[in-house]
Amino acid sequence: ADGYTRSTGKMSMVIAQNGPGITGLVTPIKTAYWNHTPLLLVTPQAANKTMGQGGFQEVEQMNLFKDMVCYQEEVRDASRMAEVLNRVIEKAIRGSAPAQINVPRDYWTQVIDVDLPPIVRLERQAGGSAAITKAAELLSKAKFPVILSGAGVVIGGAIEETKKLAEKLDSPVCSGYQHNDSFPGNHPLAAGPLGYNGSKAAMELISKADVVLALGTRLNPFSTLPGYGIDYWPKNASIIQVDINPDRIGLTKKVTVGINGDAKLVANQILEKLSSDAGNIDRQKRKDLIHQTKSAWLQKLSSLDHE
């Protein structure tokens, strides 16, 4: 379900037998949570009249997933099924994470008449004006800006906006762990993924950054994991982190500017605020280095293929 949602952009549902089936979902649901994947988790529960009596393989399913979903709710009456289901789905979409609906087994066989609740879809939010202005100033004056694109770029449909930013600044674009789809790999400015089994070219390039725009990423530890003997995270760079979830800004790395907002909206806001000469400092030198670094890494990979 996680892979389907991430590859298609369509929200999916996961359901399993109560007890052992549900416990088998623990790690996959937490993975989807950290991947910002909106999912509907349906957990059948023991029937109301036997709940809490220690029936065969009964577990506390709400407590089990408490720290693994952005929202959870148990259906208290069959007549509220549509209402609760609608709310849980919307919470998953708004939180960009799994949300859980817990349904007692005796409700699965009831036939009732319900009024379908209206779907209220909230607009994704833009970044705060002060933070956007500061981010644009840093990027406009940067000598070696680097973009690190993550899941939020994919979820927010911000790939084109990321390309525009990169091309305006002639900045290399590194991708977060498991998010190679956040920037076209055939683009001249694409440096490849960081972190575990990542691109040495991406690591070498981001190590030179004086400003990093972490766009739509929580800066997953696996995305900043040292590789090939390179501790590449730029310790003296200004870090601009953009995430739809404010709790994840500054969670793993120190940030200079935190922007709570949708990656696409924020990218457009920054583009509008960049100075007319943004990216001009050492532009050609930077472009040449990107090309040389990528070429050297590709040659190394080619030699490995033939060993």
Question: Where in this protein do the model-derived segments appear?
Answer:
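Conserved thiamine diphosphate
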Residues: K10, F56-G95, K208-A209, V257, ...
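Short internal beta-strands
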Residues: L41-T43, N102, D170-Y177, I240-D243
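Phosphate/pyrophosphate-binding active-site segments
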Residues: S79, N102, V114, E137, ...
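Conformationally flexible catalytic loops at phosphate/diphosphate-handling active centers
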Residues: R87, K91-K141, K294, L298
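Phosphate/diphosphate-binding loops
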Residues: G195-I249, K253
